[in-house]
Amino acid sequence: MEIISLKRFILLMLATSSLLTSNIFCTDESRMPNLYSKKNYDKYSEPRGDLGWEKERSLTFEEVKDWAPKIKMNKPVVNKMPPSAANLPLRFGRNMEEERSTRAMAHLPLRLGKNREDSLSRWVPNLPQRFGRTTTAKSITKTLSNLLQQSMHSPSTNGLLYSMACQPQEIQNPGQKNLRRRGFQKIDDAELKQEK
């Protein structure tokens, strides 16, 4: 790979810049060289012959009159409401029953006033589970409530609840150095007995 000398690089840059500036000046009409006159330039710049462009056609007043009946403007469709309730939002006295039927009320969510017991089971589909069983929302809630009740009656849960409810040992025996809660001490003692 050759290294270009500084003189050659400067010559290359000057030649490139002179070519670019000459092209810019030639495109400008005010700086056109004297070889061609402006008349010749205008003559050569016009397109020769018919290149397939159609002449633009101007419209007459009669044609514009003929178009008027063909164009029909449709009025916008507006839902008519009684004038007393037209500008009032729902919280200022319009009732839901006036504008909506009871059938439309059936599809509203709970936060908008729909109160039905089977709404959860209706919206949760029956999905096939393992071994071909199908579960519904009611059976899922039953299972969860049964698990919660079973866990509440287990001995480890009772011990934890007891330890949370009892008072700290420092309040009961202020002279003792061991400041652990009595419930945790009982659980630790029970674990030591099980390990032996």
UniProtKB/Swiss-Prot annotation:
InterPro entries: FMRFamide-related/fGRP. The modification Phenylalanine amide is found at residues 92, 131. The keyword Lipoprotein does not apply. Residues 22-57, 95-99, 115-121, 134-196 form a propeptide. GO terms for biological process: negative regulation of gonadotropin secretion; neuropeptide signaling pathway. It is found in: Secreted. One of its GO terms (cellular component) is extracellular space. Keywords: Amidation, Cleavage on pair of basic residues, Neuropeptide, Secreted, Signal. One of its GO terms (molecular function) is signaling receptor binding. Its main location: secreted. Residues 1-21 form the signal peptide. Belongs to the FARP (FMRFamide related peptide) family. This is Pro-FMRFamide-related neuropeptide VF. It comes from Bos taurus (Bovine). The gene is NPVF.
